[in-house]
């Protein structure tokens, strides 16, 4: 950017908005060398259709990235532009470069496979539809080359023969040299075989040169050692050199053959490389957007009456500084611009964030054009801007030896020249053709009209902004001129905004306020910076009462704005609390309804059981009367029994309402574990609950749990015991006490070391065998807990299992699950 006179105003705007810095940040998220280069030199497209396609590609790659099983990476894809260019010039490709080509083919083939396996990636399927990954070329390269890039013997029979010959000659040379070392060891400085160039030599003492005839190829720095090729191996050395030349010739022939194959598919390789770069860029856009916490923009088309909505918008470069370089936290701004607004005048003190607001808006408009997401809260709604044109800063003025005012005017002239000629309403659907919509431009003006006499500068700024209001653009301008604040009340296409100033701390808050013009606060800032108070007071006197009254009115509006914002925040908080309360009440009502249904079901079961018992008793009486000879005594007994049954049924009353009962989704406490857990299933009949405790799922008796506020589960009331029945038969034998559960080999399954499938198969068999015992101990061990979870998941759905729980600590604890059978 050293010679800005050669740049268009759109290109110069990229520099003013620090677009190259953002591109550099984006490049750090790429995975290929060409992707990084493309990201660093990324330019926004000039057509809306291209931006729409880029955004769709970003969203498609995001869906791939969000899939946990996707094999989406760019390993193996290299920058092969140099070897491709050399091949086009008739040059030779090296072995390592050929391997890079093969790796690139394999990498792109893998990416294409991921895309083709999905039905929802039409935009990417279209992108890779014409890509040829050339498996034949890849196979030929791997057949001819080893992993180190050297030509392999399998590449040709001739090469294999040459290398066998080389091996034989080397062995002959080694054998002869070993014999010389053994015979003339006194002449050697060291008993080693070394090389000088491509010749084998021995280190000979200088004084023994005459005893070792041969060719001297080198000497030590001191001259005490001569490196001599003994005469006995000179001829073999010549044969070795000749064989090496033959090997080199054959290797070059094979590389030439592979290079010619590359040349034949050069256009396919260049296209493949371009597509890989575009996919890498799309992936980088996704990852950079994710890092920013950004959301995709929804385009507002010309004629759309929706407002531009950018809530909690953050400057991406300041966010980078805060996160990566330890800079201050970014203060987000909110932009909501109605569709009829054409010009926004931002006023307020210096260093208050006016220029940052301009740059933020300009940068995110560029980001949207290249397919990046916007660092703002959802939903992001904004138009596609045909051009982003800015006049920010005085760099151009300094470079061209212009005054500040002249520099601004020259740049504004270029902005006006870049806008479409003629006065058109881009937001009027009657003017725009549906097939050829006129997209607006975005014009950003910093300190419009500054650098000259305030009266003339203000008049010029008003005229300029009124002219821009008639153009197909949205203009955002910062200013200190109070006259510009009044334009809103004269023309509905104008809007005011201001950067907030804290009168208490005498410092800006960097928040953007809409609808209220700002105060320059020059005197307050001067006082905060240390200017003597007497000077500040004298300036206030010179300023006059009318100006002070205006500032007081604006200050009052700002105070009312803050008060309304506080009330809105309180109302929002109250709304959130109400929603939470509503959810809690709804959950409680659902819980009560569930308990009512459960209670009714329980009562129905009790009634059915009582009816069945009564029928059985009556049947017994009838059978007794039918078996023996009727007598008055038996008839009397039967009458008494029937009366007793009738009295029992009349005495039946509805059970008491059940007290605390756990519900699905509720968190409860298990005192024996000292942990809380979440209820996933309630079995009222078995008086157990299924709970999730960390990674464990288990069944726990209700008697062993309590609510978070300490309430114990109240068991359902038992039916009144039926009085002892008067029977005609001999009295029944005394009821047996429940059997004691005893662990034996027959009711114990050890599945440690089993895979889950085998464990389930063995568990099914063991459950059937343990039916008589009524209980089954399953030893699964502790380990990672995966086998335990699988076993307990299997038990929770098995019809033979009534409940299950972890064994006591003295019986295996978390390594053993006890299943109680029906």
UniProtKB/Swiss-Prot annotation:
* Sequence ranges assigned to domain Smr in this UniProt record: 749-822
> Keywords, A to Z?
ATP-binding, DNA-binding, Endonuclease, Hydrolase, Nuclease, Nucleotide-binding, RNA-binding, rRNA-binding
Entry superkingdom: Bacteria
- The catalytic activity of this protein is classed by the Enzyme Commission as 3.1.-.-, 3.6.4.-
Which Pfam families does the record cross-reference, listed alphabetically?
A: MSSS, MutS_V, Smr
- SMART domains linked: MUTSac, MUTSd, SMR
Q: Spans of biased composition, class Basic and acidic residues?
A: 709-728
Q: Which PROSITE patterns match?
A: DNA_MISMATCH_REPAIR_2, SMR
Q: Name one GO molecular function term.
A: ATP-dependent DNA damage sensor activity
Q: Where is this region: Disordered?
A: 707-737
Residues that bind ATP: 348-355
Tell me one GO biological process term.
Answer: negative regulation of DNA recombination
Q: Could you tell me which HAMAP family the record lists for this protein? A: MutS2
Main role?
Endonuclease that is involved in the suppression of homologous recombination and thus may have a key role in the control of bacterial genetic diversity.
The similarity comment for this entry is: Belongs to the DNA mismatch repair MutS family. MutS2 subfamily.
How does this polypeptide assemble, per the annotation? Homodimer. Binds to stalled ribosomes, contacting rRNA.
Give the protein name, as stated in the record.
Endonuclease MutS2
Report the source organism: Synechocystis sp. (strain ATCC 27184 / PCC 6803 / Kazusa)
Encoding gene per record:
mutS2
């Amino acid at each position: 950017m050293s010679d800005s006179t050669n740049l268009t105003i759109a290109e110069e705007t990229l520099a003013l908005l620090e677009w190259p810095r953002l591109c550099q940040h984006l490049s750090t998220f790429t995975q290929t060398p060409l992707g990084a280069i493309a990201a660093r030199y990324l330019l926004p497209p000039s057509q809306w259709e291209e931006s729409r396609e880029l955004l769709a590609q970003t969203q498609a790659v995001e869906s791939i990235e969000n899939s946990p099983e996707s094999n989406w990476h760019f390993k193996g894809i290299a920058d092969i532009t140099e070897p491709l260019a050399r091949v086009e010039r008739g040059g030779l490709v090296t072995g390592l470069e050929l391997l890079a080509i093969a790796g690139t083919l394999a990498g792109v083939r893998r990416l294409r496979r991921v895309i083709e396996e999905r039905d929802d990636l039409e935009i990417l399927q279209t992108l890779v539809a014409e890509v040829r990954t050339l498996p034949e070329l890849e196979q030929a390269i791997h057949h001819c080359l080893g992993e180190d890039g050297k030509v392999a013997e399998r590449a040709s029979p001739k090469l294999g023969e040459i290398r066998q010959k080389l091996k034989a000659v080397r062995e002959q040379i080694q054998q002869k040299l070993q014999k010389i070392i053994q015979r003339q060891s006194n002449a050697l400085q060291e008993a080693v075989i070394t090389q000088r160039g491509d010749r084998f030599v021995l280190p000979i003492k200088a004084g023994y040169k005459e005893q070792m005839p041969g060719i001297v190829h080198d000497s030590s720095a001191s001259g005490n050692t001569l490196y001599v090729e003994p005469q006995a191996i000179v001829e073999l050395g010549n044969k070795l050199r000749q064989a090496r030349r033959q090997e080199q010739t054959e290797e070059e022939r094979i590389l030439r053959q592979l290079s010619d194959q590359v040349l034949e598919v050069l256009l396919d390789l260049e296209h493949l490389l371009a597509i890989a770069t575009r996919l890498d860029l799309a992936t980088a856009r996704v990852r950079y957007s994710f890092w920013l916490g950004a959301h995709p923009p929804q385009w507002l088309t010309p004629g759309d009456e929706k407002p531009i909505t950018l809530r909690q918008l953050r400057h991406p470069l300041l966010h980078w500084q805060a996160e990566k370089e330890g800079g201050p936290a970014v203060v987000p701004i909110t932009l909501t611009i109605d569709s009829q607004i054409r010009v926004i005048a931002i006023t307020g003190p210096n260093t208050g964030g006016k220029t940052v607001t301009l740059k933020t808006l300009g940068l995110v408009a560029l980001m949207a054009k290249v397919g990046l997401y916007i660092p703002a809260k959802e939903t992001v709604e904004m138009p596609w801007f045909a051009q982003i044109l800015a006049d920010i800063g005085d760099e151009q003025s300094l470079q061209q030896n212009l005054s500040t005012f002249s520099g601004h005017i020259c740049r504004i002239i270029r902005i006006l020249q870049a806008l479409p000629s003629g006065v058109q309403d881009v937001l009027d659907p009657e003017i725009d053709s549906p097939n050829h919509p006129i997209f607006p431009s975005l014009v950003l003006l910093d300190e419009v009209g500054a650098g000259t006499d305030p009266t003339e500068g203000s008049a010029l700024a008003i005229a300029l902004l009124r002219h821009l209001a008639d153009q197909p653009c949205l203009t955002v301008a910062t200013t200190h001129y109070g006259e510009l604040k009044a334009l809103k009340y004269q023309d509905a296409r104008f809007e005011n905004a201001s950067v907030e100033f804290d009168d208490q701390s005498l410092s800006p808050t960097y928040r953007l306020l809409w609808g209220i013009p700002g105060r320059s606060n020059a005197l307050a800032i001067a006082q905060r910076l240390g200017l003597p108070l007497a000077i500040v007071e004298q300036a206030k006197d010179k300023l006059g009462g009318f100006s002070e009254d205006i500032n007081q009115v604006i200050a009052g509006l700002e105070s009312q704005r803050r008060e309304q914002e506080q009330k809105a925040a309180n109302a929002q908080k109250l709304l959130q609390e109400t929603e939470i309360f509503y959810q809690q009440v709804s959950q409680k009502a659902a819980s009560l309804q569930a308990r009512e249904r459960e209670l009714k079901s329980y009562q129905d079961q009790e009634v059915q059981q009582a009816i069945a018992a009564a029928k059985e008793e009556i049947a017994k009486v009838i059978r007794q009367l039918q078996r023996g000879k009727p007598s008055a005594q038996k008839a009397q007994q039967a009458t008494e029994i029937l009366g007793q049954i009738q009295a029992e049924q009349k005495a039946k009353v509805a059970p008491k309402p059940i007290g605390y009962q756990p519900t699905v989704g509720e968190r409860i406490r298990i005192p024996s574990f000292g942990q809380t857990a979440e209820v996933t299933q309630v079995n009222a009949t078995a008086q157990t609950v299924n709970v999730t405790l960390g990674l464990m799922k288990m069944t726990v008796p209700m008697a062993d749990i309590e609510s978070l506020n300490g309430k114990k589960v109240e068991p359902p009331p038992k039916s009144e015991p039926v009085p002892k029945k008067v029977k005609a038969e001999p009295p029944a034998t005394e009821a047996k006490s429940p059997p004691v559960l005893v662990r034996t080999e027959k009711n114990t399954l050890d599945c440690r070391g089993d895979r889950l499938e085998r464990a389930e198969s063995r568990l099914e068999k063991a459950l059937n065998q343990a039916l008589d015992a009524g209980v089954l101990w399953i030893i699964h061990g502790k380990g990672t807990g995966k086998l335990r979870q699988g076993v307990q998941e299997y038990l929770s759905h098995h019809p033979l299992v009534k409940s299950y729980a972890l064994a006591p600590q003295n019986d295996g604890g978390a390594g053993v699950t006890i299943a109680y059978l029906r």
